[in-house]
């Protein structure tokens, strides 16, 4: 869709570190695809001799293909090996996080990445179980956690637990901070940055950054007390429409925020 609206001299520079993503590449001379994390945006633009960009779009979601493919281990459905790596060449995976992180580290990631108020109890239960047997499969982890949810709350609870682990495996919040920080230098005047988030941890970061130009609760100011935030909001946020939800029910948690470089 972006290519359809792009002029003949425009460039679309795309990043995706997933090995499977190359199957969807369109044959178009305006498209430059790099199979790597988007934190390499600044480095890649230097390589392409591009000084500034007019727009940045970051879609932070996991694709349906990744969720549905058992070998990727993103889904909490039984029979999946716990993996969750976006970049399958990296060493650390979900098994490593679950079985080697300390109880305190697990508690922190469940609380910060998943907003789970009983994060300490969840971490304690996992640490007790892994002493008996290494947790490798989704059905094993689900069994360990079954005392924390009812049949009614099962899906939402497990989704947040798995989300917390996935964020840690892929260092998603650290990478999000990096791409937002780079956008201040790379966007041209009146350039637009748009970010699609799928959970509150991501959304809080983006909302604060667009509001303050940094990740602090207050904007950085000059000696006269004027805000140094280089952005203004394009709009507050957008949620999927009813028609969009019918096409893709997994988009229900998506939230789009946009800001303009001033």
Language model features by range: what are they?
Residues 1-262:
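S-adenosyl-L-methionine-dependent methyltransferase catalytic core, i.e., the SAM/SAH-binding region
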